[in-house]
Amino acid sequence: MSKFLDPKADLTFKKVFGEHKHLVMSLLNALLPLEEGRQIESIEYLQPEMTPRTPFSKDTIVDVRCEETGGRKFIVEMQMSWRASFKQRVLLNAAKAYVSQLPSGKEYHLLQPVYSLNIVNDTFEPDMEEYYHYYHMVHDLHTDKVLEGLHLVFVELPKFRPSS
């Protein structure tokens, strides 16, 4: 029996990254595709529960949710085993975090990007050798044209090698 807790286990993950700001900032800065000079320097934790505004919408809970002083929002999830619906759940959670920023009567330019970092202890893209998968909205023909808003990152732990 191991004398150490597995950091991938749900409660341990939430305890480590949900209560130690410097650790979650280090993780986010290391794994998110942040622009040069836009590293995260300060965060505040947000409630992990995202209650819908409409009565028949789904409640969702994430492992860690926080925002930085500049307004960017971050979601961190640890998923032990892959389910086909996980990508849709990630997209739903990120979209909810995005739209919840804008109360009625506020201007659209106030919306800040939402970054969702998802660490998966399973292989879900077996035909790809990369362990790091970054999704965001880009123009089909002109990939330098990006719609700011949702940034989804998935890390497949079984494919990761320290030399990667």
Where are these regions (language model features)?
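Elongated, amphipathic alpha-helical interaction scaffolds
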Residues: 1-164
